Amino acid sequence: MSATPVAILKTGLVTSVGLSAPSTCAALRAKLTNPSETRFIDSSGEWIMAHQVTLDKPWRGLTKLLKMAAMVIEEALSGVARKEWPHIPLLLCVAEPERPGRLDGLEDQLFLDIQTELGAQFSPQSAIVAHGRVGVAVAMAQARVLLGQGKITRVLIAATDSLVSWPTLSHYEREDRLLTPSNSNGFMPGEGAGALLVGTDTGTAGELLCTGIGFAREAAHLDSCEPLRAEGLSQAIKAALSDAGLEMHHMDFCITDLSGEQYYFKEAALALSRTLRERKEEFDLWHPGECTGEQGAVAGAAVIAMADAACRKAFTKGSNILAHMANDAGQRAALSLQFRGAT
């Protein structure tokens, strides 16, 4: 292992199937889903369906993002005294710059609005992580660096995102990427927020650890004309496993950000075939997006929170978990997660 593991101390989630991490993860385990009609109609005259988060008021845009973010941050920090919050860096994950229909204010206004909503300040080491679906993995790498400096013991990673807006939906509808009655090769848009309070590994039993992080770039990304061989994702997986001092056959199952498109399922299958060199009886592939829809930057937080809940409640296939995420533009990320059970 080339770096100190990062411990997942507490999680928070807001999704279309639950307004907290426990309720969302229970729904994910039961494979519940809650799509609803949006205000928008596609080119065939059908209502566009989405996994929408229902809050106290019908907030939209930046306001809804900050309300959801505030909820998950409060959940993840529920055991931390308010006076300690200013010493905790907040790494806020948002949509990537190239996202169609991306809201203005994600790099500056959103962070300030969240602090105002919470009535709190976070550490000057806080940062915006605008990397979409791979953002939480990028933030995890940044958190590991911050924790490794020895001056802080906790970092808060939060993500908030929504694909439920007309500029975004109309783009994906024109590209035939939305799941509709006439298109099975698509995703259902979603929204939500997630938070992970992470800290230094103290050897405490019953904690999920991030022991390896890997990144790469896929040349044959979704919009390219190159044949898909999953080279980028395979490289990211190998890097994460090498970082953790593990091999693919040590992993018990995989949790990913897959949300419905055949391209990404094919990529995941190819990456598994390229990295798994010893036969295993089974190797399950979990994907929370089947219940929550495509959540963009929130996907990584949902993946890790699901892994954490599954380990703590002992309904996993084992304690070694591979997680991986992918952006449309080619960025790939993988994490090695290991649960230290009670002795």
Annotated model-derived regions:
Residues M1-A141, V145-K151, T160, V164, ...:
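Conserved "HGTGT" condensation-loop signature of ketosynthase/thiolase-family condensing enzymes
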